[in-house]
Amino acid sequence: MNFLYGLQSATRNQFLSGVNTLARRRTWTPPAGCPLASRLPAVNANWGLSTVSHCYSVILLPRNLHFCRTLKNKRSRCLSSAQSKEMGVLTYNWTVWGDASCSPNYAAIREVRSFHTSAPRQAAPVPLLMLILKPVQKLLAIIVGRGIRKWWQALPPDKKALFKDSVKRNKWRLLLGLSAFGLLFVVFYFTHLEVSPVTGRSKLLLVGKEHFRLLSDLEYEVWMEEFKNDLLPEEDPRYLTVKKVVYHLTQCNQDVPGVSEINWVVHVVHSPKVNAFVLPNGQVFVFTGLLNSVTDMHQLSFLLGHEIAHAVLGHAAEKASLVHLLDFLGMIFLTMIWAICPRDSLAVLGQWIQSKLQEYMFDRPYSRTLEAEADKIGLQLAAKACVDVRASSVFWQQMEFSESLHGYPKLPEWLSTHPSHGNRAEYLDRLIPQALKLREVCNCPPLSGPDPRLLFRLTVKHLLEDSEKEDLNITVKKQKPDALPIQKQEQIPLTYALGKRTAG
């Protein structure tokens, strides 16, 4: 097992690669100018390289600063806390920020090797089979249901009466069979529940992690093909900003289950869409439209924390599992609809009603629940990264205010897969006091300046007052051309107020 190099500089990746070489070949000689060269004898002595001929792996826990290796006899040895801290501080100071003395000629390493609990060839057929069978099972349900209806319609009256009598005689057996099926379904459901280590909530998982990771890799290839001409280069300041935020969030939350297990890779797409998403395999996609919509790094940190929370919590696999379960139950109801409805037109109408009921009663409410959970965990990730969490609700207030200014129609929340902007802002406002306490626990510096939420409300109030006075001024001029002009109050632009708060 090797290191996974993620959002690291080329020099730090070279050092980690050197530590891996040290583990495999027992020797690694860094350049003379590397500040880490004088510390390697202590590493060799602690790991016993003079007596042990081979080791299997070297592990670096970034925030805990422990360098460990697994020996051939399956035992592990770690540097002491003081030695690990010294090595970690040197690694961070001299390599993360671009010191070239350790590796002047090495390019950045994006990914070395992925972890697998099963061979990729064994993992491939299952998710691909699910994708293929999903439309097939719906077609099969329609064919079976329609066939049952045609069979029943073709039966003569005497055979229909005979069949009804048989059902009445065996009703208890049928009831017992249905009860057994229901019991098996309940057992299947509860045996596929898993408890999230982050939230403690039980969730249904029907898709294995490796199988779903393969699906994520396939989805990643599709997105990369679509965005191949719109990706910003790694030298672009916007890319570097997003990379810095993602790296800071993940490094400050290494103790959160799942964060350290994912190799986070950043992609910035040149697009006016206000959007960002993270695939379950750690591929982060951020659109420049979102970068233009946020006011400062605090808002961007919260939004990326929200997307990272989706990946860490496994929401994609959870939603896919729910969809598979509902598809199975829907197949039963679909068969019944096509069997009971006397005409195909009525069956099509019944199928449409069934799909809409499933969408608006299960799919969309569940999606809104997952979004709210990602908001909560994303706010906690941002708080542990010492972000001004008060800016989180301001972003959604800005989005709501912008939509109202543009006159966009306000749809009911139950029609959407996401909570409304106003409800999200209110929900975050209720969570912010707890997030501020978490910042204090993490020894973050105290927040300075006024509350950005108050600044935003005052700014909006001034904008609305000035707008009303301008409208009143125009109306008075039309009615009384000779009237004295009304003195216009000084307008406080939105960008100025928010920029002033950011500078503070």
Swiss-Prot record:
Example of a GO biological process term: cristae formation
Ranges per topology, Mitochondrial matrix: 123-174
Location of region: Cardiolipin-binding: 127-146
Binding-site residues for Zn(2+), renumbered to this chain: 306, 310, 371
UniProt cofactor note: Binds 1 zinc ion per subunit.
One GO MF term: metal ion binding
Biological role stated in the UniProt entry: Metalloprotease that is part of the quality control system in the inner membrane of mitochondria. Activated in response to various mitochondrial stress, leading to the proteolytic cleavage of target proteins, such as OPA1, UQCC3 and DELE1. Involved in the fusion of the mitochondrial inner membranes by mediating cleavage of OPA1 at S1 position, generating the soluble OPA1 (S-OPA1), which cooperates with the membrane form (L-OPA1) to coordinate the fusion of mitochondrial inner membranes.
Name listed for the protein in its UniProt record: Metalloendopeptidase OMA1, mitochondrial
